[in-house]
Amino acid sequence: MERIACVGRETAPSCSVSSWRRSMKPCSHTGLTKMNLHQDHEFSSQDPLSKCLEAKKELESAISAVLKAEQQVKENGREVKSQVQSYISRHLECLRSREVWLLEQADLIQQLKEETLQQQSQQLYWLLGQFNCLIHQLETPHSTDLVHQISVCLERLGNLALKPEESSTLYFEADVPFLRQAIATFGSIKTLSSSEEKQVLSTAVPCPYVSQNPWLLNNCFVPAAEQRPLSGMWNTPLSDWLQQKKPTSVSQCYTPYIPSLCTQDWLLKNHVAEPNEELSKPNMEEIWGQLGELNNWLLQSQQKENLECKSSSSQFSIEKLEDKDAESQDLEDMDLSDWLISPEVTEDPTNVAVFKAFDEDYKINDWLLKVEACGNCCGRQTSALEIENLGKLKCLNDQIGGKNNVSSSNDIWLLQSSQPVFKPQDVCKANEQCSTFAECVCDESCEKEALRKWLWKREGKDKNGVLQKQRQNLKNREPEKAEPSISMWLHPCRRDAQSSTQKTQECDPSVKHMMDLVETPLSKWMAKSNLTEEKASKETTQSKCSPQAETLSPFHLPLNAANWVLPLKTVDKLEKSEQSAIEDKWLLRKKAHDYYGLPSVCDLFACMKLAADKEKWLYQSPLQM
């Protein structure tokens, strides 16, 4: 009874209270047994409790609906405020662009007026100058043709306009009241009651995209877009925009479309199949089957449903649709790689072996020869050391300790052909000697000229680049013999090489012995079986006496190691002095320029270790595994 009293104080619906009162009335039937009376008594005691519980549930659902509506009102209020701000900001942006356009138009009109007035002023100034000349000539008459000039100038003056062709009036005209009215009446905030909202949602027409897809209309619930008339701005024809006509009425702002928040509206409505309705109507299983066929080429799913079975009715429960939504959500959460088919490609072992070299990492230093020490610098000049990079230098101890490595034969030519050091005081030819070669004012650098003379002097040439012994050789030279026809086609340097080989054969005894051995017939080297010991003894005695045998046997000569080693490729001084070809002056200058104009070569040799074998400097292809 306490529960009933507590519930009675709440605002319960009238229908439940009246039904409870009717149920509390005494029964009018008299033919009931005691058992029936006992059951009625229990039923009458339980009926008010169930009704109170139902009333409580209704109140709780109503409170939750009110709270949800309140929350939705807050969200809609924020949305409306954001829309108002966006609309106003867009129109402010339009006003700003309109302002910029008007300013540009004002500048353009001002520029056109100024150009027109400047042209008129130029014509007037030119005519004024003509009249000034005529007035000066009339005051001091020197010619008789002044009458014609005066008539021409007066005619031009009559054709010109003496007033400004363009007016200085320039003002801005704006319909301020219309702008104020448009701004004041722009936009409105409206709301709908619950009944009107349901009516709008029921009578709404779907969007054009959905209307063009009958499959969506027949099988899925689509929230329809509200069919709203366009505002006055968008309903205005294009001619009114061009003519800038004022609209007759202020445009009305219609309420935006608010989608339904009820989950029942988004689900498929249940309906009982009529007997005359065709059972071949597409159902939900068939719908998902069509979508699955579209995604078969993208998805290889392990959980494939049996899409071929079709149900005869179109009744589906809400639980089944929720399962479908859960499955679609699981598909959305899947990784993109699970949706795409990655074909299994078997790699060819030959291709792997070919492209393996491109995939491996390599370093450039692995292909270059490592420098062990820097003792082979040009002229034994120690290069400058950077304080920041002292720890990175490999030969720091060699340079600081002053160790002198034993120079090999390959380094001797570097020391011998080191560049001489010239002083500006000794070489400069100018009246006022320069302090450095960089400040030299001569046409050609004094340092280059001194270097050229030093090179010519080392080669045994005079200041003009001609050999000093050449004239003596030309005077003492005998007439040459007629060369064979083959040597006429040879290059002069080849002729010199051929003559030098003949001279070496004549001078070197070992080469002469070898040539004699080659020219001897093979019969002298063959052993004869019919020779007796007496004849052999005679030949030995003859061989001791004859000097020709000594020439034919180089083994009887004293051992000379130089005869068994190939001669050096360096050119002797004798061959240099006996060169017959005369070198031109421009060629000598070119050699001097190449020698002096490439200091990077010296830097290159300063970093190279010339004591190493030449084959190590050649490029070697990497080993193929």
From Swiss-Prot:
Keywords associated with the record: Chromosome, Cytoplasmic vesicle, Lysosome, Nucleus, Receptor
A Gene Ontology BP annotation from the UniProt entry: intracellular iron ion homeostasis
Molecular functions per Gene Ontology: transcription coactivator activity
Cell compartments where the protein resides: Nucleus; Chromosome; Cytoplasmic vesicle, Autophagosome; Autolysosome
Major subcellular location class: nucleus
Domain of life: Eukaryota
InterPro entries from the UniProt entry: NCoA-4, NCOA4_N
GO cellular component terms attached to this protein's record: autolysosome; autophagosome; chromosome; cytoplasmic vesicle; nucleus
Subunit field text: Interacts with MCM7.
Function (record text): Cargo receptor for the autophagic turnover of ferritin. Acts as an adapter for delivery of ferritin to lysosomes and autophagic degradation of ferritin, a process named ferritinophagy. Plays a role in erythropoiesis, possibly by regulating hemin-induced erythroid differentiation. Binds chromatin before initiation of DNA replication and detaches during replication. Inhibits activation of DNA replication origins, possibly by obstructing DNA unwinding via interaction with the MCM2-7 complex.
Name of this protein: Nuclear receptor coactivator 4-B
Species this chain originates from: Xenopus laevis (African clawed frog)
Organismal lineage: Eukaryota, Metazoa, Chordata, Craniata, Vertebrata
